[in-house]
Every structure is written in C-alpha cells, then in structure tokens.
Amino acid sequence: MSIRIIPQDELGSSEKRTADMIPPLLFPRLKNVYNRRAERLRELAESNPLGDYLRFAALIAHAQEVVLYDHPLEMDLTARIKEANEQGKPPLDIHVLPRDKHWQKLLHSLIAELKPEMSGPALAVIENLEKASDQELEQMASALFDSDFSYVSSDKAPFIWAALSLYWAQMASLIPGKARAEYGEARQYCPVCGSMPVSSVVQIGTTQGLRYLHCNLCETEWHVVRVKCSNCEQSRDLHYWSLENEQAAVKTESCGDCGTYLKILYQEKDPKVEAVADDLASLVLDARMEQEGFARSSINPFLFPGEGE
C-alpha cells in the first residue's frame, strides 16, 4: 500500500468518506510538537544514564519551538501538490524540492537561541556552523538527505537537521488537501517528504489502536498496519523485544526477512510517549538489537551515524 495526497478540489464525496474512516496521514500539529518533545526529553533525562544528552536534545527542541514562532512561513503549496500528485511523488520530496534561504535563516536563529546555553565542544560546533558559507550549508544539507554521513560530522548533523526539520514541518503543516491510501509502493518512507521514520506509535484517542510511523524530518505521521514489517511489509518472521516485560511502553519490532527493526511506542501503556524522545532514551534496546544481528531502519534526528558507521 502507498499513500498519495489528493488536492482538495479533486476529492469526490466517496473519497472524503473513505479518508475519514482511517486517516492514512496525520499532518504535523506544530502548536504542540516541540514543547511536548522538550518536556518529555527532560522528564526521561531524570532517570536515564544518557541524561546529559537528553537534556542537550531538549535544548534544541525548545529552541525549535522559539524559532518556529519567530519565523513563520507563508507558502502556497497548491500547485506543488497537484504536480506531485500527477507524478506520483511526495509533494515535499527531499531529493526534488528546491530549498530556499528560509531554512538557513532558521538555522542561524537556532544557533543564536542555543549559544547562551552551550559550552565546550558543543559551543565550538555551533560557532563553526555560524561561520559556514551558504554553499557549505547547502552541501551539508544535501549530504544528509543523501545519507552521506561521511560528509557531515555527527556533532554538526543534529543542528543542521533541526533547521531542515523545522522548515519541512512548517511546509507540511501548510499542505492543502487530504491523503488517500492506494495499492502500490511500500510505506517505509514518508509520503510527504520521502524521509525515514524515527519510530512508530500505537495511538490512543480518535486513532485508538492504530500504528503510525513518525517522520524524522517533517513530523508527519502515516498509517501502517500492525504486525507487518514497516520496512519490507512481510509478516511471517516478526518478533517483539523489550527491556522490561510484555507491558512495556517501548518495544522493537524485528523482521527476520529483511534483518531490520523499528521501535514501537504504545500510548495506552504510557500516554506521554513521544516518537523522538522515547526512541532516543531507549538506546540500550538498540544495543541489544545490534547484538542480535538486526540493523536499524530509522534515524533519530538527534543521533546520526558517524563516518564509517
């Protein structure tokens, strides 16, 4: 199954009814994303061996919240949605969509917001980014989108990604139209921008019991049925792992067919779970999965592979 975004003027009444049954796509609600993430990171840091890094990530998330309101984005995406729909491509495809200077403005604002909070190596990193030319920043952005992690050091990547993510999330929140589920390509990548998921969440509320993958870039969530590998769509060799017990709020789903795994967070076990924060706070589970021979099928926006990883 694949998901396409249909312009509002092309949605017939039957399509509107279908879209209302199980929403294939949940566009980002930016009013709550970054504050909630920062709060969750700080909460998890209190009893986590990686507490210092979680608090560092919380500073970035809080800065994203501040910059979001300091630099709102106005953009008409109607024509872009129609063009992408005709081409069968994600409307905000990271490999196709031209980037304007807005994302670099966001980056410099993030740096200005974070500078008073940073010291030591972290301060040196953002000062280095502050001096980078526009061309150098664009090259780093392209390298991250191409998964060329040898070009962007793992200490610079979270800051670059934080600005890119904020830019793409702003655009995603402005998309007009609805999404429709169709038969076709697999759903391992975000239908809005084509980036990877960070984790998946089994939700409560109006989407009770449904699993949504959470994009690590534009913050969109897309529906993927449970008990099916989100990477290869097989279901015959799936296993679930946790560090606590069967009632754990954070588990991994491993697939013997493709050899990958993805975290699954259960809101009914803990309503506070957050796609990025709880994934980052459970790296011990990642280490266990690597010991078992599985490769991660996602990337956390605060933890990028270093060169050679």
UniProtKB/Swiss-Prot annotation:
Record family assignment: Belongs to the FdhE family.
Keyword Membrane on entry: no
Keyword DNA repair: no
Cited SUPFAM superfamilies: FdhE-like
Originating organism: Salmonella arizonae (strain ATCC BAA-731 / CDC346-86 / RSK2980)
Predominant localisation class: cytoplasm
GO cellular component: cytosol
GO molecular function, one term: ferric iron binding
Protein name as it appears in the record: Protein FdhE
Task performed by this protein: Necessary for formate dehydrogenase activity.
